[in-house]
Design a protein with these regions (language model features):
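Active-site-proximal alpha/beta segments of enzymes that process anionic O-linked groups
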Residues: 1-218
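Short, intrinsically disordered, charge-balanced linker/junction segments flanking boundaries
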Residues: 219-224
Length: 224
């Protein structure tokens, strides 16, 4: 694995060919029947741009005008669906359910078969320009091998030395991509932020509430 990663870094190995070879060696299962029925579609005259802003480990009760005013104001201009449940309480199963709309218990079967979600397949069939930007690496969990398995030149990771720095880099990269993309095609943007997961803030960030922990030791957390 180390040898492969080193040779890939210097361009001596075709990463896509390597992934195809790995997929061929996986123990494929036959118990996955997804989707259950053939998908019926209708012609779309003018596909709309779609943006998903996803924040890992963000507590739902902090989505309000006081705690997150910018996101709150943005949401007031659209539709809010507040009766939906996550398919899991961790990153792997939560993102999995968002794209596949099935429980996270199907993760392994989908992964070994490299089965992409109907949603992503439909976007690509409609010739969407795909802007996939994540702070954390898309290789752990292995979203590059299921959700985004068919996305060419997938952006695997962000540049930065901290969770907050990775989030900033993600935003800057997306802005650059969106400004230079092919405007003749519709766009799907997936922005996956991670700072709440790592409990990290940009330098000089003005805190909203006091007292406030500088860092969190998860092993010492209790109800008090």
């Amino acid at each position: 694995a180390t040898s492969n990663s080193t040779m890939t870094k210097y361009g001596w190995i075709d990463q896509e060919a390597l992934e195809r070879q790995k997929a061929m060696s996986l123990d494929r299962k036959s118990d996955i029947n997804y989707p259950l029925t053939p998908i019926k579609t209708q012609p779309v005259e003018k596909p709309l741009n779609i943006m998903w802003i996803v924040v890992d480990s963000w507590r739902a009760d902090t989505f309000n005008a006081e705690t997150s005013p910018n996101m709150w104001n943005l949401a007031q201009k659209g539709q809010v669906f507040n009766q939906h449940y996550s398919t899991g309480n961790c990153t792997r199963t939560g993102i999995f359910g968002m794209f596949y709309a099935i429980p996270g218990t199907y993760w392994h079967g989908i992964l070994v078969n490299r089965q992409t979600p109907v949603f992503m397949d439909r976007l690509q069939a409609l010739n969407y320009d795909l802007g996939i930007f994540a702070a954390a690496k898309l290789t752990n969990p292995e979203f590059d091998q299921n959700v985004f398995a068919k996305v060419r030149n997938l952006r695997i990771s962000s540049e930065g030395s901290s969770p907050a720095g990775l989030d900033v880099g993600l935003t800057e990269d997306w802005l650059k991509w969106y400004g230079q993309r092919d405007r003749s095609k519709p766009a799907f943007s997936f922005l996956f932020y991670d700072a709440p997961h790592g409990y990290d803030f940009p330098e000089g960030y003005k805190t909203q509430f006091q007292p406030m922990l500088k860092e969190v030791n998860y092993l010492k957390l209790n109800n008090e």
